[in-house]
Design a protein with these regions (language model features):
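N-terminal [4Fe-4S]-dependent radical SAM core
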Residues: 2-71, 273
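Alpha-helical scaffolding segments of alpha/beta enzyme cores, especially the outer helices
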Residues: 123-133, 153-156, 179, 199-203, ...
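Residue-level recognition of short loop/turn positions
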Residues: 80, 115, 291-292
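Radical SAM enzyme [4Fe-4S]-AdoMet core and its adjacent flexible, acidic
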Residues: 6, 11, 161-313
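Short, solvent-exposed coil/turn segments at beta-strand boundaries
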Residues: 38-41, 107, 288-294
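Core AdoMet radical
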Residues: 68, 87-95, 108-121, 131-150, ...
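Cysteine/selenocysteine-centered motifs that mediate thiol-based redox chemistry or coordinate metal-sulfur cofactors
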Residues: 317-330
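Canonical Radical SAM [4Fe-4S] cluster-binding loop centered on the CxxxCxxC motif
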Residues: 59-97, 299
């Protein structure tokens, strides 16, 4: 029996692309194909707004190449968020983006670039241009503070089509900020379950925010010490109000951790879940820490491995371990 999976209108964006469920409100969308490739027993089609469609004649999707990756390129950041799962610091190290493994990315791979603050990496522009030459689809996640400080530079990079999606971790929602976000069609606001609440989400809607990605709270890194009962209460409150939250935005997405914490599956029929859920961590995706030269199933995996000679060999290793039920530390 043939199968089809669709990730709709999710800009090739930001961190935790693995397994996102995107449930758009009904709206006509006109899309241009920007990439088509065969992956194992299925075909992948990517559109200019980030929509991705998988199609197969079989009963399941069996990949033989990486589709998307979360990539850390720096551990330097001057903000010091107390919940940062990467433990980034003002004197954190940058990755060497001349590492030859970069050249092994296959065309149309979606690369979610993060840190730290990726905007402070001295090789960022050259790196983005190289990924464009490789026909990859890079995106970035930045903090609101850095988005405001580097707005003109970000707009220039976007206009040069050096990245396709921009995830912005929000700290203080204002009208000026929302207006700036609206200038980048590929921008998606990132919020963390437990650190945001229903009223904040309603305020975003009132200010015209259209795309939101809810990330699960990572009890990892500095986030482990910062976690408390108030955060858990906020998570519980979001979960209890998901029926209302799902109506607020044109596109609402969740990473795998938020899917679990907020019980997102309960919002969908079995048919919708089969269509929109894009897979578990490590099924089509992986995490690469270019600073420490290791890789894992996800950014919260405690089990990490030294970089291999190609990106795809690393993905196939993660997938094989996953299929063998090897504990990967998530």
């Amino acid at each position: 029996m043939s199968q089809i999976q669709i990730l709709i209108a999710q800009s090739v964006v930001a961190q935790n692309t693995a397994g996102e469920v995107t449930k758009p409100n009904n709206k006509e969308v006109y899309m241009k194909v920007v990439g088509v490739y065969k992956n194992g027993n299925y075909k992948v089609t990517i559109f200019d707004n980030g929509t991705k469609i998988r199609e197969t004649e079989d009963d399941e999707f069996i990949p033989n190449r990486l589709e998307s990756v979360d990539m850390k390129i720096t551990n330097k950041c001057d903000i010091g968020c107390p919940f940062c799962h990467e433990k980034s610091t003002p004197d954190g190290e940058h990755a060497d983006l001349n590492n030859p493994v970069i050249d092994t990315f296959l065309p149309y791979t979606e690369i979610a670039i993060g840190g730290g603050n990726p905007l402070c990496h001295p090789q960022l522009e050259d790196f983005l241009r190289h990924l464009k030459e490789l026909k990859c689809f890079p995106s970035m996640t930045v903090n609101q503070k850095h988005f405001i400080e580097e707005y003109d530079r970000i707009i220039q990079l976007y206009n040069e089509k050096l990245f396709y999606g921009l995830g912005i971790s929000i700290t203080n929602l204002t009208k000026d900020f929302a207006d700036k976000v609206s200038q980048i069609p590929g921008a998606v606001i990132h919020v963390i379950a437990g650190l945001t609440n229903l009223e904040s989400l309603k305020q975003m809607k009132e200010l015209g925010i259209k795309k939101v990605l809810i990330l699960g709270y990572k009890v990892f890194g500095r986030g482990e010490d910062f976690y408390n009962q108030t955060i858990q209460d906020n998570i519980n409150n979001l979960r209890d109000n998901m029926q209302e939250i799902k109506t607020l935005f044109e596109v609402l997405s969740f990473d795998n951790l938020a899917i679990e914490q907020l019980n997102v599956k309960s919002l969908m029929s079995d048919e919708e879940w089969a269509e929109f859920y894009m897979g578990d961590d490590g099924g089509y995706t992986m995490y690469i820490d270019m600073v420490n030269c290791n890789y894992g199933q996800s950014s919260t995996s405690t089990q990490r491995f030294e970089l291999l000679n190609t990106i795809n060999n690393m993905f196939l290793d993660i997938r094989a371990k996953k299929l063998e039920n090897v504990k990967l530390g998530d």
